[in-house]
Amino acid sequence: MATIQFIQGINEEVVPDVRLTRSRDGSTGTATFRFTNPKILDASMADKGEITGMYLMDTEGQIITRDVNAKFINGKPQAIEAVHVIKSPDDWDRFMRFMERYAQDNGLTFTKANS
């Protein structure tokens, strides 16, 4: 099973919008995750700990990014945006294996952008 966590041990229930970019030679890229009203920002989670990163967990292990930011509207947190930088073809392959598992577990589909 593939899950996303912001505090280790607590699975995020909200499924994000994920946008991918990749360099022309395929060696690097970015994955931008946007969670609208994620469970981790709920008042009931305040005593669970601090957000220390985004942890992508699956049967192969975990992928970690520390580039995590909250978006506020009228002083209240409404969304989380996390950016994972993919630095090599091997990292890209590993990330895509995670996303295939996560998509399968959460009913997501992949739509390729028109180029």
Swiss-Prot record:
The keyword rRNA-binding does not apply. Coiled coil: none annotated. NCBIfam families: PS_II_psb28. Belongs to the Psb28 family. It comes from the Eukaryota. Part of the photosystem II complex. This is Photosystem II reaction center Psb28 protein. It is found in: Plastid, Chloroplast thylakoid membrane. Its main location: plastid. GO terms for cellular component: chloroplast thylakoid membrane; photosystem II. The keyword DNA damage does not apply. GO terms for biological process: photosynthesis. Keywords: Chloroplast, Membrane, Photosynthesis, Photosystem II, Plastid, Thylakoid.
